[in-house]
C-alpha cells in the first residue's frame, strides 16, 4: 500500500484535540485490519496541553489550566495555532524497529528545516529536534516527537513550531526539561513561515522514505498484541 496524506484542517479552522484523537483511533483500527492505507494526518490544533504517561504534577500548568492525558510516552507539551502537527498512522515495515522509526521522524524534520535554512540537530538523551547554542541564544527546541506503537501500527507523532506563540510554554515545564527553551521557524529565520507553507515539505520527505516505512497490513504481520511507547517530546 502507498502512504497517503490527509490535510485535516489548518488555520483558521483549528482542530480540537479530542476530535483528532478520535480520528487517530478509528484510522489506527482500520490500518491494523487492512481496511485503510497507512496515512499521515496533518493539522493545526486549537490550543491545548497534553500529558504523556511520565508527566509529573510539578510540570503541569502553573495557573491550573486543564491538561488532556494521552497514551503516548513522554511528558507535558503544548499544541496550538502556528504549530504543524503530524500523526503518522503507519503499519511499520518492521514493527519492532521503534528506535529506527523515531530516527526516521527526526530525519524528516531535520530535512524540512534545512529547506528553510535552519540547522536542526539531535541532542543525546533528548527526543525531538533542537538548535544548538549560537549567537541567537542557548540550545532550544523546535520540534517534539511522541509516539505509540500498537499491533505494529504507529500513533501520535510530531509537532513542529512554525510561527506559533511561545508564551504557553512559559506556563509549564515542557517535556520535563528545565534547562532549555523553545523556538520557532519564524524566530530563527526572521520570516513568516506558516504551517501551510511547511506542509508540502513534510509530505515530500515522508514520501521519499515510504519504502522503508511501510510494511504489509498489520493484520497480516506476526506482531505481539502489545503497545510500545517510543521516545517522546
From Swiss-Prot:
Query: Mainly resides where?
Result: cytoplasm
Q: Which Gene3D superfamilies match?
A: Bira Bifunctional Protein, Domain 2 (3.30.930.10)
BPL/LPL catalytic domain sequence ranges: 34-214
Q: Where is this site: Lowers pKa of active site Cys?
A: 141
GO MF terms listed in the record are: lipoyl(octanoyl) transferase activity
GO BP terms = protein modification process
Q: Which residues cross the membrane?
A: none
Identify the CDD domains for this entry. LipB
SUPFAM superfamilies per record: Class II aaRS and biotin synthetases
**Where is this chain's protein located in or outside the cell?**
Cytoplasm
What more the UniProt record tells us is: In the reaction, the free carboxyl group of octanoic acid is attached via an amide linkage to the epsilon-amino group of a specific lysine residue of lipoyl domains of lipoate-dependent enzymes.
Family of the protein in this entry: Belongs to the LipB family.
Q: What does this protein do?
A: Catalyzes the transfer of endogenously produced octanoic acid from octanoyl-acyl-carrier-protein onto the lipoyl domains of lipoate-dependent enzymes. Lipoyl-ACP can also act as a substrate although octanoyl-ACP is likely to be the physiological substrate.
Name of the featured protein: Octanoyltransferase
| Source organism per UniProt | Renibacterium salmoninarum (strain ATCC 33209 / DSM 20767 / JCM 11484 / NBRC 15589 / NCIMB 2235)
Amino acid at each position: 500500500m502507498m502512504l497517503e496524506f490527509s490535510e485535516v484542517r489548518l488555520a483558521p479552522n483549528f482542530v480540537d484535540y479530542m476530535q483528532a484523537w478520535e480520528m487517530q483511533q478509528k484510522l489506527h483500527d482500520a490500518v491494523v485490519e487492512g481496511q485503510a492505507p497507512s496515512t499521515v494526518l496533518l493539522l493545526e490544533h486549537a490550543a491545548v496541553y497534553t500529558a504523556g504517561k511520565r508527566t509529573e504534577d510539578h510540570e503541569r500548568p502553573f495557573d491550573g489550566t486543564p491538561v488532556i492525558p494521552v497514551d503516548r510516552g513522554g511528558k507535558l507539551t503544548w499544541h496550538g495555532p502556528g504549530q504543524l502537527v503530524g500523526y503518522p498512522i503507519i503499519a511499520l515495515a518492521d514493527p519492532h524497529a521503534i528506535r529506527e522509526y523515531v530516527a526516521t521522524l527526526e530525519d524528516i524534520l531535520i530535512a524540512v528545516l534545512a529547506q528553510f535554512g535552519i540547522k536542526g540537530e539531535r541532542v543525546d538523551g533528548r527526543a525531538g529536534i533542537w538548535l544548538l547554542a549560537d549567537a541567537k541564544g542557548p540550545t532550544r527546541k523546535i520540534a517534539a516527537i511522541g509516539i505509540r506503537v500498537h499491533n505494529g501500527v504507529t500513533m501520535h507523532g510530531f509537532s513542529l513550531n512554525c510561527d506559533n506563540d511561545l508564551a504557553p510554554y512559559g506556563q509549564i515545564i515542557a517535556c520535563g526539561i528545565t534547562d532549555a527553551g523553545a523556538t520557532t521557524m519564524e524566530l530563527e529565520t526572521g520570516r513568516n513561515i506558516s504551517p501551510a507553507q511547511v506542509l508540502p515539505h513534510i509530505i515530500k520527505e515522508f514520501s521519499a522514505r515510504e519504502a522503508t516505512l511501510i510494511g504489509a497490513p498489520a493484520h497480516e504481520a506476526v506482531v505481539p498484541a502489545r503497545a510500545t511507547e517510543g521516545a517522546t517530546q
